[in-house]
From Swiss-Prot:
PANTHER family: INTERFERON INDUCIBLE TRANSMEMBRANE PROTEIN, INTERFERON-INDUCED TRANSMEMBRANE PROTEIN 1. The gene is IFITM1. GO terms for biological process: cell surface receptor signaling pathway; defense response to virus; host-mediated suppression of symbiont invasion; negative regulation of cell migration; negative regulation of cell population proliferation; negative regulation of viral genome replication; ossification; positive regulation of osteoblast differentiation. The chain crosses the membrane at residues 87-107. Palmitoylation on membrane-proximal cysteines controls clustering in membrane compartments and antiviral activity. This is Interferon-induced transmembrane protein 1. IFN-induced antiviral protein which inhibits the entry of viruses to the host cell cytoplasm, permitting endocytosis, but preventing subsequent viral fusion and release of viral contents into the cytosol. Active against multiple viruses, including influenza A virus, SARS coronaviruses (SARS-CoV and SARS-CoV-2), Marburg virus (MARV), Ebola virus (EBOV), Dengue virus (DNV), West Nile virus (WNV), human immunodeficiency virus type 1 (HIV-1) and hepatitis C virus (HCV). Bone (at protein level). Levels greatly elevated in colon cancer, cervical cancer, esophageal cancer and ovarian cancer. Expressed in glioma cell lines. The keyword DNA-binding does not apply. It comes from Homo sapiens (Human).
Length: 125
């Protein structure tokens, strides 16, 4: 009878003792660039004197687009312009709204006094 021989290869220590290699991935944190879209939308809807709110809204959208593309410098430039326009829109909007209300009140009081004088003259006082 013929015997077959089987060879067993020795592979070394078990794989659990081999240390795995580590890979380091550097993820750059995005610089937070506020685009002021909500503030611009508020100024557009409620304080849009001289169309500054609408222009600020356009710059805010451009800032958001630049941020989505990855152009942080361009996004910051558009955001800075939008912020400046929003400040001016807010200041002018508040001042012109107060001025309009004062003009309306004083105009109404003046018309009331003129009408009162006309009524008194017709009655013969």
């Amino acid at each position: 009878m013929h015997k077959e021989e089987h060879e067993v290869a020795v592979l070394g220590p078990p794989p659990s003792t081999i240390l795995p290699r580590s890979t380091v991935i550097n993820i750059h944190s995005e610089t937070s660039v506020p685009d002021h879209v909500v503030w611009s939308l508020f100024n557009t809807l409620f304080l849009n004197w001289c169309c500054l709110g609408f222009i600020a809204f356009a710059y805010s959208v451009k800032s958001r687009d630049r941020k989505m593309v990855g152009d942080v410098t361009g996004a910051q430039a558009y955001a800075s312009t939008a912020k400046c326009l929003n400040i001016w829109a807010l200041i002018l909007g508040i001042l012109m709204t107060i001025g309009f209300i004062l003009l309306l009140v004083f105009g109404s009081v003046t018309v009331y006094h003129i009408m009162l004088q006309i009524i008194q003259e017709k009655r013969g006082y």
